[in-house]
């Protein structure tokens, strides 16, 4: 949102210098050799000979080092094939339980039981293993393509390999001449390195950071610790922590893909050179998950099976949305809604930032500028128009003694503590306490506060912001505390700021005596979890939650926007890699603030931004206090572009929604990099300026000022312009094409082999859902064409569960000689029939020049009828290469199977 922006200049430099006055000594002063660790040698090993799916070993320290604290002497390493496509490697202290994310926070396979008080029986079993003296000990199963190899050298290492290609996916084999490649395990410093095969590996993920390219650049440090830093700052740690990466290999099999998750909630640096990836983590354990793929989509499916599938979003959330920090009163809100209506630009959701609150206190209304009676009338009018209303909540609860939320929070003892009493921070209301969302009573408290507010004002969704946690003050560290001042300094804010800076002190305590140090990165995740649960309980509808801070698995509960970007062309560029990153992270409902949040936008930038932003999964215009107003109707050229691109978006709403169904079912993103559909095309690996919606709709925006063309990459196949079906691009192999992109135009193409079910343009999603369907069939030169459609009421909590409350349709099209056949396969068609949805028109693209269409027949059930020739049109495209065929007036029930034959 809108925190006072750290300049990353003088203020940061002052703190940076102070850090070195109070911090620990440097590596070279701690260890004369400059070596931070000497690694471990394997003491004993055992492979489960029954299932052949697990291996355990006890590595013992080779030599002590004094840097960053005392080494842990004995480790336990467990490698387990949890499924045929997932391998887990867990490394921890063999004698003492350490912090790791509990299963009741992030549900996955049950963690191994705690080590016994006496390990002698374990030692006897393992030491008797005849494999201990072997140089390489394998864990392999005939049903899995993944192999774990324990490298029994001094120091030891391990590798993960793909059997089918003999490719090493993760190589933690130490280089005896380079101590930086040794495993180091200190209480507050874990160090693990994997070598990479240079240019064969293409790495994506490890967020959250703003950057100009989706593929990670070499020679950088990616820091993961949630911080309130504007996303307009590239290459620094931002609001979320996602220690997951995807590796797409260009050989030995082009497109062979795997994923790696380090499930750890502590702060960390990940150094990526191109040849190595090194984890430097300040707590917890090493808990690695390897996902076999081998396709990018399969990797995300396997990854989200562990962290949780994305939550379904309500249908209305795919409409266009408007917000601003600085709407001063309810009359301004009314004016904005009226402005969109007058300009005939679709507006689905109106938002309000902290302006609506009484003295910035959660769950209140400003009695002067946003009085209850006027706000109720405003929201009721939105609902009558088929529109929605969303407001913001910040986690800081004002300590004003007359504030009822504060009083109830104190009564139920729900706040985070430090030194035995609630920790006092400062945010917008002034002094605040923060709820401890690990505490069971916090769910009851939060649910009750939301209930009281919904009874006051029936908002449709909640926006949870500032939940990194952001704090306007930096509390002094507890003297001598290595939690507030850990020995290893992660590259916080890009300048190694102390981790206590402008947030909750790491020594604050959560329920269960868990220090903030360990769960800092989980706060946004936990707040989203309780907020979603509260809304489901209170409304019995599918909730909409938007969170700024996220962690692996947050997609189960929330959507995300990319935070406080700026109205610059650079930020427009950053938005695509950020959107694609969150698709990988299992949060498909994502978008950037359209036209830019910080600073004044321009007409040209805003016009180009709405052209792109109309195709973000989450599409919202948002700007900051003190900036020029940037609603889309403020400039006629922007309004015209908005009508055009949002018109296409609204016709594609059934497609967006079907992609949401696919995402919540198997984790696949809505917006995808090109290599998801074309993994064997190596040129797609480095593309950051284009993206796909689903598998075949490609968006190629203008990202520079003053240009009227764009050079776009087209993978092999025939591609058709979704704004003008008579325009097409043919690529026999992948190639770059310069496309016309006048000021009012963005290039959006659909590839052959796809079928889209679309509806009509409208001002709201509610109105769009009442229009007839239009089937766009893009014939393929290489076989059949396919499409899918999922529909329900858009608000039921689950998708596709309760039979009779949803409809799923598969469309198939194929051609032979002078015949084209289009069929539908319907599952649970009753819902579509009850809504009286019909397919009125079918448009067919990709039919080659010379194809003669003389008529058509339609079969529904046992009845076949001859089509009306007057409803059939056939026109050549602009290049004379294809014809565009269209049949109108079909009136086919969507919920009933049909067969359409053109001859």
From Swiss-Prot:
InterPro entries membership: Gal_mutarotase_sf_dom, Glyco_hydro_31_AS, Glyco_hydro_31_C, Glyco_hydro_31_CS, Glyco_hydro_31_N_dom, Glyco_hydro_31_TIM, Glyco_hydro_b, Glycoside_hydrolase_SF
Residues bearing glycans: 64, 219, 400, 491, 501, 600
Glycoprotein among keywords: yes
Description of post-translational modifications: Four different forms (I-IV) may be produced by post-translational modification.
Biological processes, Gene Ontology terms: carbohydrate metabolic process
UniProt KW Signal keyword: yes
Signal sequence annotation: 1-24
Keywords: Glycoprotein, Glycosidase, Hydrolase, Signal
Organism the protein comes from: Spinacia oleracea (Spinach)
Catalytic activity: Hydrolysis of terminal, non-reducing (1->4)-linked alpha-D-glucose residues with release of alpha-D-glucose
Enzyme class: hydrolase
MF term (GO), any: hydrolase activity, hydrolyzing O-glycosyl compounds
Stated name of the protein: Alpha-glucosidase
Active-site residue numbers: 465, 468, 564
Known EC number: 3.2.1.20
Function in brief: Alpha-glucosidase I and II have high activity towards malto-oligosaccharides and starch, while form III and IV have high activity towards malto-oligosaccharides but low activity toward starch.
Pfam families: Gal_mutarotas_2 (PF13802), Glyco_hydro_31_2nd (PF01055), Glyco_hydro_31_3rd (PF21365)
Coiled-coil regions, chain positions: none
PANTHER family named among the record's database cross-references: ALPHA-GLUCOSIDASE, P-TYPE DOMAIN-CONTAINING PROTEIN
Tree of life domain: Eukaryota
Protein family according to the UniProt entry: Belongs to the glycosyl hydrolase 31 family.
């Amino acid at each position: 949102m809108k925190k006072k922006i750290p300049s990353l200049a003088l203020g940061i430099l002052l703190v940076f210098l102070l850090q070195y006055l109070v911090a620990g000594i440097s590596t070279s002063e701690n260890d004369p050799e400059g070596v931070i660790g000497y690694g471990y040698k394997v003491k004993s090993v055992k492979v489960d000979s029954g299932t052949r799916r697990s291996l355990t070993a006890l590595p013992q320290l080779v030599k002590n080092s004094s840097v960053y604290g005392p080494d842990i002497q004995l480790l336990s390493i467990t490698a387990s094939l949890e499924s045929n496509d997932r391998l887990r490697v867990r490394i921890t202290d063999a004698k003492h339980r350490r912090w790791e994310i509990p299963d009741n926070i992030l549900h996955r396979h049950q963690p191994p039981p705690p080590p016994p008080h006496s390990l002698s029986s374990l030692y006897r079993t393992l030491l008797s293993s005849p494999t201990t003296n072997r140089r390489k000990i394998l864990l392999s199963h005939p049903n899995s393509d993944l192999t774990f190899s324990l490298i029994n050298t001094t120091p030891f290492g391990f590798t993960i390999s793909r059997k089918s290609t003999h490719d090493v996916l993760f190589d933690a084999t130490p280089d005896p001449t380079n101590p930086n490649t040794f495993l180091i395990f200190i209480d507050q410093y874990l160090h693990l390195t994997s070598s990479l095969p240079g240019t064969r590996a293409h790495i994506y993920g490890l967020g959250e950071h703003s950057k100009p390219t989706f593929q990670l650049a070499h020679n950088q440090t990616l820091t993961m610790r949630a911080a309130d830093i504007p996303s307009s700052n590239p290459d620094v740690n931002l609001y979320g922590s996602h220690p997951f990466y995807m590796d797409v290999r260009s050989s030995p099999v082009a497109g062979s893909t795997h994923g790696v998750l380090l499930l750890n909630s502590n702060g960390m640096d990940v150094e990526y050179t191109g040849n190595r990836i090194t984890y430097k983590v300040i707590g917890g354990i090493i808990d690695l998950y390897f996902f076999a793929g081998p396709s990018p989509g399969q990797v995300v499916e396997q990854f989200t099976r562990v962290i949780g599938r994305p939550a379904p979003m309500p249908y209305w959330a795919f409409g266009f949305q408007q917000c601003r920090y600085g709407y001063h009163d309810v009359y301004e809100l009314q004016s904005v809604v009226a402005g969109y209506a007058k300009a005939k630009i679709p507006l689905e959701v109106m938002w309000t930032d902290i302006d609506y609150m009484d003295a910035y206190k959660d769950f209140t209304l400003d009695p002067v500028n946003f009085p209850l009676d006027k706000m109720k009338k405003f929201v009721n009018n939105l609902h009558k128009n088929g529109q929605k209303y969303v407001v913001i909540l910040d986690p800081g609860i004002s300590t004003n003694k007359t504030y009822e939320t504060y009083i109830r929070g104190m009564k139920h003892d729900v706040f985070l503590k430090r030194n035995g009493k609630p920790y006092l921070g400062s945010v917008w209301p002034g002094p605040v306490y923060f709820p401890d969302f690990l505490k069971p009573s916090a769910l009851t408290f939060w649910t009750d506060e939301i209930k009281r507010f919904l009874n006051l004002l029936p908002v449709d969704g909640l926006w949870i912001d500032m939940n990194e946690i952001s704090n306007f003050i930096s509390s002094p560290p507890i003297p001598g505390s290595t939690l507030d001042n850990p020995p290893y300094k992660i590259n916080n804010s890009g300048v190694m700021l102390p981790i206590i800076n402008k947030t909750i002190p790491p020594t604050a305590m959560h329920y269960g005596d868990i220090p903030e140090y360990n769960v800092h990165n989980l706060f946004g995740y936990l707040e989203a979890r309780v907020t979603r649960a509260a809304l489901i309980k209170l409304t019995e509808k599918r909730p909409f939650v938007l969170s700024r801070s996220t962690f692996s698995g947050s997609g189960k509960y929330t959507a995300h926007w990319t935070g406080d970007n700026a109205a610059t062309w650079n930020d427009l560029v950053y938005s695509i890699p950020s959107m694609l990153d969150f698709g990988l992270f299992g949060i498909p409902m994502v978008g950037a603030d359209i036209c830019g949040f910080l600073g004044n936008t321009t007409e040209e930038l805003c016009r180009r931004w709405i052209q792109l932003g109309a195709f973000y999964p989450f599409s919202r215009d948002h700007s900051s206090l003190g900036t020029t107003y940037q609603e889309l109707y403020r400039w006629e050229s922007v309004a015209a572009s908005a009508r055009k691109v949002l018109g296409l978006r609204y016709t594609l709403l059934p497609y967006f929604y079907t992609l949401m169904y696919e995402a919540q079912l198997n984790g696949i993103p809505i917006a995808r990099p090109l290599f998801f559909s074309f993994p064997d095309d190596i040129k797609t690996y480095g593309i950051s300026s284009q993206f796909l919606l689903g598998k075949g709709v490609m968006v190629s925006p203008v990202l520079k000022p003053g240009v009227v063309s764009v050079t776009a990459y087209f993978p092999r196949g025939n591609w058709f312009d979704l704004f003008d079906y008579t325009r097409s691009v043919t690529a026999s192999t992948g190639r770059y094409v310069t496309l016309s992109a006048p000021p009012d135009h963005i290039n959006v193409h659909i590839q052959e082999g796809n079928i889209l079910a679309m509806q009509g343009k409208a001002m709201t999603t509610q109105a769009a859902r009442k229009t007839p369907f239009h089937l766009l069939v893009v014939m393929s030169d290489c076989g059949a064409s396919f499409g899918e459609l999922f529909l329900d009421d858009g608000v039921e909590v689950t998708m596709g569960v309760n039979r009779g409350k949803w409809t799923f349709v598969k469309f198939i099209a194929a051609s032979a000689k002078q015949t084209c056949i289009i069929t539908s396969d319907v599952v649970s068609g009753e819902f579509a029939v009850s809504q009286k949805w019909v397919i009125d028109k079918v448009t067919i693209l990709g039919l080659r020049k010379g194809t003669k269409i003389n008529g058509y027949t339609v079969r529904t059930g046992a009845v076949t009828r001859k089509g009306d020739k007057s409803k059939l049109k056939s026109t050549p495209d602009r290049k004379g290469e294809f014809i565009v065929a269209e049949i109108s007036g079909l009136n086919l029930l969507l919920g009933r199977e049909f067969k359409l034959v053109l001859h």
